[in-house]
A protein has these predicted regions:
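Sec-dependent N-terminal signal peptides
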Residues: 3-14
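Sec/Tat signal peptide C-region and signal peptidase I cleavage site
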Residues: 15-20
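Extracytoplasmic substrate-binding proteins
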Residues: 21-23, 30, 119-198, 219-220, ...
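Short helix-initiation/N-cap motifs at beta->coil->alpha
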Residues: 26-28, 84-97, 223-233
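Structural recognition of the beta-strand scaffold that forms the well-ordered cores
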Residues: 41-43, 60-63, 106-110, 132-135, ...
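A short, structured surface patch at a secondary-structure boundary
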Residues: 46-101, 106-115, 218
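His/Asp/Glu-enriched short active-site or ligand-binding loop at hydrolase and phosphoryl-transfer sites
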Residues: 206-226, 269-276
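Ligand-binding pocket segment of bilobal, Venus flytrap-like solute-binding proteins
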Residues: 219-220, 226-251
């Protein structure tokens, strides 16, 4: 196996492009990339969505093959791209042999730019000879992430178009929140999984959408804990959210009849909402550009009078601009059944 990897690396090195340019990624790394980037290996699911939205013809494959219920919401030419595995995150199963077999012009990761990911990018780039850039996946950085990727992939106009759309959505929400004091904003709990007891602490990448939409994440210990945690039922009852968002139909099906969950304001007032998940989750799963659709949805949930949006129109427009699909009426209705608490079977 070691000999095979060495052979593949040696085979890869001579075909690096003669004409190259440099780009500074979100980690401050100066990376030499080809003048024309035609193929990209996505290091994980967030990166695959980002690349697909920006320049779908460059994506060499999905880290996980699309499921049947997701396919209608991706443009037809890209539904059958091969499964490539992933280089980063939980369950990373792609290996360097696979990357070298694909021979992409560029590797992209979208998410954290902490030292762990910088070290991985440097190591993979050194071992394969393939340039590897890191793009900051924090929600607030989304416009800049789009600009960086648009420039890297040779489609700066597309990057600017999407960045402007994101900034407009952020500005629309900010205008609403200017008139809503922090203490009057909805208390929101993200209920992950079939039991609803996995959640994301305030400030985590999994719950940025709550805070950006103007909700107060009740999973807040003052910043002592970040990321996903397992909550107890007692903690949820004490936090007493007035709004619960979830993407698991198993949880949604039973929460209103569960005597423990009935102790929360959210269940008592019927403010438990099920997020659509096709082709990607609206809340996270993964935390990428798909969250922009969830942000629009959640702003409408939390501030329906001020937002004054039409979810059907907003969804159709988003899927056209970002996922490059024209939804039929049937596809739109099937998608929004989730948001109405009726996940399609």
């Amino acid at each position: 196996m070691r000999l095979l990897l060495t052979f593949l690396v040696l085979m890869a090195l001579p075909i690096l492009p003669a004409h190259a340019r440099t780009i500074v990624d979100s980690a401050g790394r100066t990376v030499e990339i080809p003048e024309d980037v035609n193929t990209v290996f996505a290091a994980g699911p967030p990166a695959s969505i980002l690349v697909y939205i920006m320049k779908p013809e460059a994506l060499t494959g999905w880290p996980r093959a699309l499921r049947p219920e997701e396919r209608d919401y991706i443009a037809a030419p890209y539904r059958d791209l091969p499964e490539t595995g992933r280089l980063t995150g939980r369950g990373g199963e792609a290996n360097l042999e696979r990357v070298l077999e694909i021979q992409p012009d560029l590797i992209i990761d979208f998410g954290s730019v902490r030292d762990t990911y910088i070290d991985l990018a440097n190591r993979v780039q050194e071992q394969t000879g393939i340039p590897y850039i890191l793009i900051d996946g924090r929600f607030e950085n989304t416009p800049e992430a789009l600009r960086i990727l648009g420039e890297a992939l040779g489609v700066p106009e597309r990057g600017e178009e999407l960045a402007a759309d994101v900034k407009a959505t952020f500005a629309r929400i900010d205008a609403i929140l200017e008139n809503v004091p922090e203490e009057e904003r909805p208390r929101v709990y993200l209920a992950r999984g079939p039991e609803g007891l996995e959640t994301g602490m305030k400030g985590s990448i999994n719950t940025e959408i709550i805070e950006r939409a103007g909700g107060r994440n009740v999973a807040d210990d003052g910043g002592a804990t970040r990321g996903l945690v397992q909550a107890s039922m007692e903690q949820v009852i004490v936090a007493n959210p007035d709004t619960i968002v979830n993407w698991d139909p198993n949880f949604y099906d039973k929460v209103f009849d569960d005597p423990l969950w009935q102790g929360t304001d959210a269940v008592q007032t019927g403010r438990v909402y099920l997020s659509p998940t096709a082709p990607f989750g609206w809340i996270d799963r993964p935390p990428s550009l798909n969250r922009m659709m969830g942000l629009i949805w959640m702003a409408g949930l939390l501030y329906p009078e001020q937002w004054q949006g039409d979810l059907r129109d907003d969804t159709r427009a988003f899927y056209k601009l970002y996922y490059q699909v024209d939804l039929t009426d049937d596809e739109l209705e099937r998608l929004l059944e989730w948001a109405e608490g009726r996940p399609p079977l």
